[in-house]
């Protein structure tokens, strides 16, 4: 996964960090965050897309190998947030990129993040994505 903060308040990043920590451990589900979009099959976007982050976000998407999966994490990425004014925003994420997975919340909990990513893990495996593996035991979250 490549995470791009497109202009958030960092609430979603805090929860994503918790989901990656030892208690939830995203890695046990085959998920890891990579520094380069060239090594990612999931683009995880947080925050509303600001004017200043638009080009960087689109460049990250273009650098990803096929199949490209975009996940919107949090209400701001879904166009329902309270940050910014229309003049500061490039538009809703869904108008800029094809969003596959929507994970609502302000911010979503680590459990919601993992459960929200579960469907795309199975889809990714069916499409032959190489880096994301299926969630073997979703009940492990409970």
Q: Over which residues does each language-model region extend?
A:
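Iron-sulfur-associated redox domains of electron-transfer enzymes in respiratory
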Residues: 2-142
């Amino acid at each position: 996964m490549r995470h791009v903060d497109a202009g958030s308040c960092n609430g979603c990043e805090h929860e994503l960090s918790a989901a990656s920590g030892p208690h939830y451990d995203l890695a046990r589900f085959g998920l890891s965050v990579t520094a380069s979009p060239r090594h990612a099959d999931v683009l995880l976007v947080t925050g509303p897309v600001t004017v200043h982050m638009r080009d960087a976000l689109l460049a990250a998407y273009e650098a990803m190998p096929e199949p490209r999966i975009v996940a919107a994490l949090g209400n701001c990425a879904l166009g329902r947030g309270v940050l910014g004014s229309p003049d500061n925003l490039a538009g809703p994420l869904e108008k800029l990129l094809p969003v596959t997975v929507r994970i609502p919340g302000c911010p979503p909990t680590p459990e919601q993040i993992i459960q929200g990513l579960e469907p795309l893990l199975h889809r990714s495996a069916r499409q032959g994505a190489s880096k994301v593996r299926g969630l073997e035991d979703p009940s492990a979250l409970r």
